[in-house]
Curated annotation (Swiss-Prot):
Note on domains (UniProt): The catalytic core consists of residues from subdomains of the finger (11-75), palm (77-161), thumb (163-224) and little finger (240-335).
The encoding gene: dinB
Biological processes annotated in GO: DNA synthesis involved in DNA repair; DNA-templated DNA replication; error-prone translesion synthesis; SOS response
Organism, scientific name: Caldanaerobacter subterraneus subsp. tengcongensis (strain DSM 15242 / JCM 11007 / NBRC 100824 / MB4)
Every UmuC domain range: 5-182
UniProt-annotated site: Substrate discrimination, residues: 14
PANTHER family linked: DNA POLYMERASE KAPPA, DNA REPAIR POLYMERASE UMUC / TRANSFERASE FAMILY MEMBER
PROSITE patterns assigned to the protein according to its UniProt record, in alphabetical order: UMUC (PS50173)
Task performed by this protein: Poorly processive, error-prone DNA polymerase involved in translesion repair and untargeted mutagenesis. Copies undamaged DNA at stalled replication forks, which arise in vivo from mismatched or misaligned primer ends. These misaligned primers can be extended by PolIV. Exhibits no 3'-5' exonuclease (proofreading) activity. Involved in translesional synthesis. Primer extension fidelity in vitro is temperature-dependent.
InterPro entries: DNA/RNA_pol_sf (IPR043502), DNA_pol_Y-fam_lit_finger_sf (IPR036775), DNA_pol_Y-fam_little_finger (IPR017961), DNA_polymerase-Y (IPR050116), DNApol_IV (IPR022880), IMS_HHH_1 (IPR053848), Rev_trsase/Diguanyl_cyclase (IPR043128), UmuC (IPR001126)
Descriptive protein name: DNA polymerase IV
Length: 384
């Protein structure tokens, strides 16, 4: 039986919420993101996109392109509230929902006794009625094609890609439209004269494997309409991280290390909450020329406390020869494994106390409606 996969993608989500909440912004270029000189665009309205503005663009550049635009800070809590409304609608249709981000998801409706197009129209109507927002929906028999379809007629689009349309419908597309081909891979392909999917279809599988390794097989299949990836209702957490764009470029390692200490606490809290260990710690920097560099270290035993993560991250940065000024610093952990209490050593029993204390603090704060119980590091930050 051919699967029936739906890809749901909200249109300019953050900016659309701002326009919905503030009617005076409707029809005007709205740009949401970090408002400092070093901030970047999170998203922008379709009116702003006409000026060449796009996500991840430095905010100062967006202001140059559209000085008359409405520039707004990110209201994460508000966007999460709206996202919850939307996902409640999706889960009401099927339990087989894979959240991709705050504003994007896949649904497997193979066993829903309803035409996929009717389901798509229902989603669009219910989201519009509940939030006032538009959503683009793609329908196909696998995830790659469903996502491609949702992007076809944005905003407020609805597109179906059937088996008999492939590969013809894909041929004119740039190679960057193929899942698994980013800008760097596209550059590699352009260097050998391959710019479109039609060009790519002419390459034998062996050549794609030479270029991309195992991913070459997946790319070979996808451009022929084959993608066996399931809709994952419980997505595996592969990494946890935190990063920050600095107010001012710096080479000051002490300042950067202080940020890593703060990030270690945030990452540790998330590991404990998810009941996970990690073995690999990665430090990321973005230099003044926007080049991204990462260095990782894998330790012998699984760790999860902030002091352990911090020591590894600090060691990585101390050995790093910084030749350029740094504009962004980040920390992430990976190589994760579930916590198993029965395997904890005597010293590790502190984890149980931390989890219990953390959960109790969360519950009290939740019931009171305020964050009255804080960590020592939070109190120090508040007093600065």
């Amino acid at each position: 039986m051919k699967r029936k996969i739906i890809h749901v993608d909200m249109d300019a989500f953050f900016a659309s919420i701002e326009q919905q909440d503030n009617p005076e912004y409707r029809g005007k270029p709205v740009i949401v993101g970090g408002l400092s000189g070093r901030g970047v665009v999170s998203t922008c309205s379709y009116e702003a996109r006409k000026y060449g503005i796009h996500s991840a663009m430095p905010m100062y550049m967006a202001k140059k392109l559209c000085p008359q635009g409405i520039f707004l800070p990110v209201r994460r809590k508000r966007y999460e509230e709206v996202s919850e409304q939307i996902f409640r609608i999706l889960y009401d249709i099927t339990p087989f929902v894979e959240p991709v981000s705050i504003d994007e998801a896949y649904l497997d409706v193979t066993h829903v006794d309803k035409n996929p197009e009717d389901i798509a129209l229902e989603i669009k109507k219910r989201v519009k009625d509940a939030t006032g927002l538009t959503v683009s929906v793609g329908i196909s028999y696998n995830k790659f094609l469903a996502k491609l379809a949702s992007d076809w007629n944005k905003p407020d689009g609805l597109m179906v890609i059937t088996e008999d349309m492939v590969p013809e419908i894909l041929k004119p597309l740039p190679v960057t439209k193929v899942h698994g081909i980013g800008e760097k891979s596209a550059e590699k392909l352009r260097s050998i004269g391959i710019e479109t999917v039609e060009d790519l279809l002419k390459l034998p599988q062996e050549n794609l494997i030479e270029l991309f390794g195992k991913t070459g097989v997946e790319i070979y299949n996808r451009i022929r309409g084959i993608d066996e990836r399931p809709v994952e209702t419980m997505r595996e957490i592969k990494s946890i991280g935190k990063e920050k764009t600095l107010e001012k470029d710096t080479k000051n390692k002490e300042l950067l290390i202080q940020h890593l200490k703060e990030f270690s606490e945030i990452v540790s809290e998330e590991l404990i909450k998810e009941r996970l260990y990690c073995r690999t710690v990665t430090v990321k920097i973005k230099t003044a020329d926007f080049a991204v560099h990462t260095k990782s270290k894998t330790v012998d035993k699984y760790i999860r406390f902030s002091e352990d993560i911090y020591e590894v991250a600090k060691g990585i940065l101390e050995e790093w020869k910084l030749e350029q000024y740094v504009r962004l610093i980040g920390l992430s952990v990976s190589n994760l494994s579930p916590v198993k209490y029965e395997q904890l050593s005597f010293l590790d029993k502190r984890l149980v106390k931390v989890i219990k204390a953390g959960n109790l603090a969360e519950e009290i704060n939740k019931r009171i409606g305020k964050k009255i119980i804080k960590k020592g590091s939070e109190l120090l930050k508040d007093n600065k």
